Amino acid sequence: MKKAVLIAAMFCGVVSLSSCCRIVDCCFEDPCAPSSCNPCEVIRKKERSCGGNACGSYVPSCSNPCGSTECNSQSPQVKGCTSPDGRCKQ
């Protein structure tokens, strides 16, 4: 019985952690994230259940997240920048 509870707890921890990590993707990787996207506030609201989209309705925009036609390769937000062919870099 204890083993089953331990396995369930580990599984839930991994699942909730992966969901909570989306906050980083939404709020920190995209330099055009709106000021209303406050990860601390989101964590407070979703503290008990981080399932689903932890950033609410905010979706990072891949149209031109760097604010120019080219990406700054030194930028910490380079992950969200668009490539020359217009697709979003992963």
Curated annotation (Swiss-Prot):
Coiled coil: none annotated. GO terms for biological process: regulation of cell shape. It is found in: Cell outer membrane. This is Small cysteine-rich outer membrane protein OmcA. A lipid is attached at residue 20 (N-palmitoyl cysteine). Pfam families: Chlam_OMP3. One of its GO terms (cellular component) is cell outer membrane. GO terms for molecular function: extracellular matrix structural constituent. Residues 69-90 are annotated as: Disordered. A lipid is attached at residue 20 (S-diacylglycerol cysteine). Keywords: Cell outer membrane, Cell shape, Disulfide bond, Lipoprotein, Membrane, Palmitate, Signal. The keyword Membrane applies. Residues 1-19 form the signal peptide. In elementary bodies (EBs, the infectious stage, which is able to survive outside the host cell) provides the structural integrity of the outer envelope through disulfide cross-links with the large cysteine-rich periplasmic protein and the major outer membrane porin. It has been described in publications as the Sarkosyl-insoluble COMC (Chlamydia outer membrane complex), and serves as the functional equivalent of peptidoglycan. Part of a disulfide cross-linked outer membrane complex (COMC) composed of the major outer membrane porin (MOMP), the small cysteine-rich protein (OmcA) and the large cysteine-rich periplasmic protein (OmcB). It comes from Chlamydia pneumoniae. It is a lipid-anchor.
